[in-house]
């Protein structure tokens, strides 16, 4: 439905936030076949969105501002810092509607786990939620008069990512960094 909406609305932008690597549930630290399959599906859909939306689509991850000297999980490190693993799923549409929940798009969430989500359609509350969330991740990059219906949110995420990519880990004012597909492969 995102690609359909993008074809109808040429100004639509998509900012996607993902961890560097999927959560590991295997006790040996290996990816289970279900995790590998889910990761493959995720990459395939990201590639499709990138192909369909082009420069109107950005994928980002969050990195800690603490320097990671060593890790027992090197796939969880990017640019010298540990990934911030956000488990909540959220979507914000035009500051009009938002949803935050716990469900994953997999059989376990659909059949075994107890999941919940909250949807709200109060524009002022949705705008405040997006503003607080983006301000937390982008630090001072978000102008006070930002309007997602007028201004490019993706441009802000790209600028914050470029700044955080070259800054020393401890000096990053925000957490957002573009998720390179070679990190996620």
Regions of interest found by a model, annotated:
Residues 1-185:
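PLD/PLD-like phosphodiesterase catalytic module centered on the HKD motif
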């Amino acid at each position: 439905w995102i690609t359909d909406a993008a074809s109808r609305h040429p100004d639509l932008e998509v900012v996607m936030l993902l961890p560097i690597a999927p959560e590991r549930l295997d006790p040996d630290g290996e990816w289970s076949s279900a995790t590998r399959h889910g990761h493959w599906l995720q990459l395939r859909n990201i590639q499709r969105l990138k192909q369909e939306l082009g420069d109107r689509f950005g994928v980002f991850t969050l990195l800690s501002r603490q320097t990671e000297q060593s890790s027992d999980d090197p796939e969880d490190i990017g640019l010298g810092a540990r990934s911030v693993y956000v488990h909540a799923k959220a979507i914000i549409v035009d500051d009009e509607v938002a949803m935050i929940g716990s469900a994953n798009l997999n059989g376990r969430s659909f059949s075994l786990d107890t999941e919940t989500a909250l949807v709200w359609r109060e524009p002022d509350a949705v705008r405040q939620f997006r503003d607080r969330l983006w301000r937390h991740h982008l630090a001072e990059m978000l102008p006070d008069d930002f309007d997602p219906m007028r201004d490019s949110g993706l441009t802000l995420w790209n600028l914050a990512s470029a700044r955080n990519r070259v800054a020393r880990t401890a000096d990053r004012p925000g957490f957002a960094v573009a998720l390179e597909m070679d990190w996620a492969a």
